[in-house]
């Protein structure tokens, strides 16, 4: 038993990766290619991707919505986690990094046809999804894009997931900045606001998971 979350030492982190992450070979190859980019710090951790894939299986997810794709690492991990008739809709402002690293692995793993990559402002794409296929059309949504728009993304994703569906908000800790009252940056304020919105809605229940840079889980109740 422990009364609070333990901090991960390097040894414990290595142990977690050894026994808590079963990373498919195409996903691992994409992660390694991403590490060759100067922006590799934008990539989600393998333990977080594993956790999200497990959640998808636990709720029987078939339709996954991703806001912020980067090279498509989590995109591919989730596509592989879904059943054969599953589909990932991935939103990003650019396909630059997918073309640099991800698309080859999507194609070689046989997952490219399951991934619908939509390029453009994410809020606009989410509004289009609300029109077609409509509210409640997704089982899970994962928000990991420009932080200042997190409140907008959460508000739209809350409509797009079905009852008992999940909205996951990445960077919920923001490197610890969310807990610093002196940090008044717009990005920090926006993450705090999205967290507050999820917490205070009576049609959602939340849990904050200390994985990666913090993951806020919000389950739609009705």
State what each model feature region is.
Residues 42, 46-222:
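S-adenosylmethionine/decaboxylated-SAM
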Residues 1-27, 37:
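N-terminal auxiliary segments of SAM/dcSAM-dependent transferases
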Residues 30:
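Beta-strand-loop-alpha "switch" segments that mediate conformational coupling across diverse proteins
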């Amino acid at each position: 038993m422990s009364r609070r979350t333990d901090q991960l030492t390097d040894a414990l982190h290595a142990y977690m990766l050894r026994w808590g992450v079963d990373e498919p070979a195409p996903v691992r190859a994409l992660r390694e290619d991403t590490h060759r980019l100067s922006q590799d710090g934008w990539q989600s951790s393998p333990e977080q991707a594993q956790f999200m894939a497990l959640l998808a299986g636990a709720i029987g997810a078939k339709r996954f919505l991703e806001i912020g794709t980067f090279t498509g690492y989590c995109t591919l991990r989730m596509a592989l986690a879904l059943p054969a008739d599953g589909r990932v809709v991935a939103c990003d402002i650019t396909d630059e990094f997918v073309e640099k690293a991800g698309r080859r692995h999507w194609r070689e793993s046989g997952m490219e046809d399951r991934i619908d990559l939509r390029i453009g402002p994410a809020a606009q794409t989410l509004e289009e999804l609300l029109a077609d296929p409509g509210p409640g059309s997704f089982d899970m949504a994962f928000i990991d894009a420009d932080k200042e728009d997190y409140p907008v993304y959460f508000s739209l994703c809350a409509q797009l997931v079905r009852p008992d569906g999940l909205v996951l908000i990445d960077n919920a800790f923001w490197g610890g900045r969310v807990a610093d009252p002196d940090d008044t940056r717009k990005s920090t304020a926006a993450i705090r606001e999205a967290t507050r919105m999820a917490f205070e809605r009576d049609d959602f229940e939340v849990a904050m998971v200390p994985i990666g840079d913090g993951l806020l889980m919000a389950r739609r109740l009705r």
